[in-house]
Amino acid sequence: MTLSHNKSPDLRVVKTHKAIREAFIILLSEQEYNDIAIQAILERAKVNRATFYKYYSGKGDLARQMIDDFKQEVSQLFQDRLNADSQMLQMIMENHSQKMFERRQQMLALWKIRTQHHNLYHDMFLMGKQNFIELAKKQKATDYLTAEAIDYQATMMATIFMASLKYYFEKDLPLPKKLPVDWQQMLDIIKS
């Protein structure tokens, strides 16, 4: 966003970005990404073409910027998880779960964009996988697990995490606090 003299952002610019992005999210919730025309975004956001192109080179650029912004937020959540000590972990996880729930409509809409250049769902999967690998290193799991075992576990953890987000958020429900217990119960059932 454009800053005027290194002070706070121009409120008109902030409102314009917000209107365009909200319009795009609404359209994504109603139709497929490839079916959305710039004109539909303009009409929904109530901005003219020149204003749109002042900030975005096209629909793909809008998607890229929104996905990049969202990925920065998710990256911070994963970083906070990695840096949390055991005493703060529960509070941090509940806080982050709430933040993700508040952004669920945007997340679900952006997940619908699956192109060669834009795929937030896959990007979040990879971020979750990498976070698990970093946690394994931090907890010295690399001392007793092979790299292949850690890669497998990271892949499975990212898969179940993303599927859980999708499952609950599509039902308009927050992630339950007992989610790890649910996962453990699944393992218990398999072992029985």
Predicted feature locations:
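Generic hydrophobic, amphipathic alpha-helix propensity
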Residues: R12-F24, I41, M66-F70
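Short hydrophobic clusters on alpha-helical segments that form packing/core surfaces
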Residues: T16, I20-L28, M100, G128
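Helix-turn-helix
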Residues: L27-D61
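Amphipathic alpha-helical packing segments from all-alpha helical-bundle domains
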Residues: T115-T142, E148-T159
